[in-house]
Design a protein with these regions (language model features):
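The catalytic "switch" region of P-loop NTPases
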Residues: 2, 7-9, 18-23, 30-106
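Short, solvent-exposed segments of well-ordered alpha helices
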Residues: 25-28, 113
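Amphipathic alpha-helical segments in well-structured domains
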Residues: 27-34, 144-148
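Walker B catalytic acidic pair
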Residues: 14-16
Length: 183
């Protein structure tokens, strides 16, 4: 009733993978609550989480059936062959530098290598690189251009915490990747 009174069109539950850490009956109780909610609320309920959520949501058929509702989608990292060039080309339009740098094959390859197709990582890499060249121009009079060397430097300096995960993806090390269930 509260959802209808306030004209809620959709309920989004984000970070559902954190249920994996729930102790005791807390996890089961919350999953049962979500199933009941989906059955009674009368509006779409969207559950969002990393791949770590799959273990939780597919624990038994009832939860898997409810979690998939009208369908489920797993959004994985982009492969170099499938959608990467399209995505980066569209992102590349959002250059805020004074000098527009053309997108080259070398830059495309570098961005993929440093992000391994993870959209969040490549966006942050693109943003941080632009911030750096804009600051360097103001401080040292350098041109505001982007290149592969800059992107590699930015990744090395700013992505130290995620470098083990990125390196595991680069190597195709399945055992290491499994340890990081939220990639």
């Amino acid at each position: 009733q509260v959802a209808r009174i306030h004209a809620v069109g959709v309920l989004v539950v984000d970070e559902i993978q954190h249920l994996n850490r729930a102790r005791g009956t807390g996890k089961e109780d919350l999953l049962n609550f979500l199933v009941t909610l989906v059955n009674t609320i009368g509006i779409p309920v969207i559950l969002i989480g990393t791949l770590g959520a799959v273990r939780t949501l597919t624990g038994d058929f009832r939860q898997a059936r409810r979690a998939s509702g009208l369908g489920s989608m797993v959004w994985e990292r982009l492969s170099r062959a499938d959608g990467w060039d399209y995505f980066v080309t569209r992102m590349w339009r959002y250059q805020w530098t004074q000098e527009h740098t053309p997108l080259t094959e070398e830059i495309l390859e570098c961005l993929y290598d440093e992000s391994q197709g993870i959209i969040d990582v490549v966006i942050k890499l693109f943003m941080l690189a632009q911030m750096q060249v804009i600051q360097l121009r103001r401080g040292r009079g350098r041109p505001e251009t982007l290149d592969a060397k800059l992107f590699r430097h930015i990744a090395k300096e700013n992505f130290k915490l995620i470098s083990p995960m990125i390196n595991a993806l680069k190597r195709g090390d399945r055992e290491a990747i499994i340890k990081y269930d939220d990639i």
